[in-house]
């Protein structure tokens, strides 16, 4: 009886050891709840170091002097931690810029940490236009799963400009690509105005089979009202997906939703460095 108990105990120890080894090897396996935040952030920091060596540190540059000069983000100017697949662990979003032109803005890249390595799950052309001068930004949409998707905008024509949208993110099978059932919305036309007024046009996604964007009517607002609406989007106090700004300075238009700034990039790199 004693020998049988000893054998059972030994088997139990071996099984437990195997389960622990499995969790250590891949913390995404079912039943494993290993907290690898320190290792994850340390690995992400090394990736940021690699990119700052290639493209430079986050900075705000200018193409001239005086009130007419355009400012733009340069170097690794978008660095964001976000749990895109709603698994409780952050992915890393990176984008770099080499100058005041869309042609010089690099791809948006999404990295995850799996089996002790940083893996690039996506590298592609997202809505990498700019706002507030030439600070690159990414547009993010909250999914019903609790995760997030990046919005890809494609522009056609001029006066009016036609935009089409595609959401890309993690699907239920773990692949990164167009979101099933919510991949796109109809095109929308925008005409640029020479008016000096400010305005907003708010968008939300319809529930269900996700085939429709629901635009609100155009609203002219004061700059103070615009700033308040902008703040509510940035801080997540509203469920609005996009906020469009129309101004008279060259008719520039930009989507402003959860804007990633140079300051945020610097702060995120510092946060990752603390774990390294």
Regions found by a protein language model. Name each.
Residues 101-106, 159-162:
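Short, solvent-exposed loop/turn segments at conserved positions within beta-propeller repeat blades
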């Amino acid at each position: 009886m004693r020998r049988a108990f000893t054998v059972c105990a030994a088997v139990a120890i071996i099984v437990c050891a195997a389960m622990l080894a499995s969790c250590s090897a891949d913390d995404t396996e079912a039943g494993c709840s290993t907290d690898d935040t320190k290792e994850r952030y340390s690995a992400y920091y090394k990736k940021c170091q690699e990119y700052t060596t290639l493209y430079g540190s986050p900075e705000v540059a200018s193409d001239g002097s005086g009130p007419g000069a355009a400012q733009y983000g340069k170097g690794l100017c978008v660095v964001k931690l976000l749990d895109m697949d709603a698994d409780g662990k952050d992915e890393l979003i990176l984008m770099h810029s080499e100058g005041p032109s869309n042609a010089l803005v690099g791809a948006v890249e999404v990295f995850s940490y799996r089996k002790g390595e940083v893996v690039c799950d996506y590298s592609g052309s997202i809505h990498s236009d700019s706002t507030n001068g030439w600070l690159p930004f990414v547009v993010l949409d909250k999914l019903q799963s609790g995760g997030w998707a990046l919005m890809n905008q494609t522009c056609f024509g001029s006066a009016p400009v036609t935009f089409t949208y595609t959401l890309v993110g993690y699907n239920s099978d773990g692949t990164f690509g167009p979101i099933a059932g919510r991949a796109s919305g109809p095109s929308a036309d925008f005409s640029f105005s020479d008016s000096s007024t400010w305005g907003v046009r708010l968008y939300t996604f319809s529930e269900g089979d996700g085939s429709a964007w629901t635009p609100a009517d155009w609203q002219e607002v004061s700059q103070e009202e615009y700033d308040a609406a902008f703040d509510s989007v940035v801080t997540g106090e509203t469920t609005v997906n996009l906020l469009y700004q129309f101004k008279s300075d060259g008719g520039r238009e930009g989507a402003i939703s959860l804007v990633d700034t140079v300051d945020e990039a610097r702060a995120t790199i510092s946060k990752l460095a603390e774990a390294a």
